[in-house]
Amino acid sequence: DYDGFYASEVHGRADAPITLIEYSDFTCGWCVKFFQTTWPRLQAKYIDTGKVRFVYRDYPRADQGVGVEAAVASRCAGAQGKYWPMHDRLFSQGGRLDSGLFKGYAKTIGLEQVAFAKCFDERQYLESIFQDRQEANRWGFHGTPGFILIRTVGGPTEKEPAIAIPGAVPFEDF
């Protein structure tokens, strides 16, 4: 189901002809490098111009720990309409995250603290986070980051199949 994206995890126009899906972990060094060097160029050239819709999917590399907690924090921020500010804040830490800092990040981006704390402490989005990881595994990804290029309307076809791109690739390869 290529239309079942979480609205808070999408950048770009819904009618963009191409969708780029990233499977990533907030603690992954290569994912941080993509965020710092490739993402700004992709956003300026393709997403902001309406050519590509960008979808972020969680792929924490472990079943517990700070990577999972960061994914939960981003989803809880998304529940308050602030997914991308939390996403950017987490990646701006350069992969050096500590679970004790997430509630402070929530405050700095203007989240309602009680609702965020309840969501975070109850790990409300854990199941969907692990579903993202299973989906990445079905695409053949066993590490992060991984990307899928796919037609936005109608999904892949025999003539225009989805393209899986494993690993951190430079901007020029997109």
What spans do the regions from the language model cover?
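A short beta-strand-turn-helix
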Residues: 2-18, 46
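A generic, residue-level signal for flexible/boundary positions that often mark functional hotspots
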Residues: 4-5, 22, 91, 159, ...
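Alpha-helical scaffolding within the catalytic cores
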Residues: 5-6, 38-41, 134
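Flexible, active-site-adjacent loop/turn segments at secondary-structure boundaries
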Residues: 8-9, 32, 89, 163
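Short clusters of hydrophobic/aromatic residues that line enzyme substrate/ligand-binding pockets
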Residues: 10-11, 97, 165
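Structural alpha/beta surface segment adjacent to cysteine/selenocysteine redox centers
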Residues: 16, 21-107, 112
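C-terminal cap of thioredoxin/glutaredoxin-like
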Residues: 37, 103-174
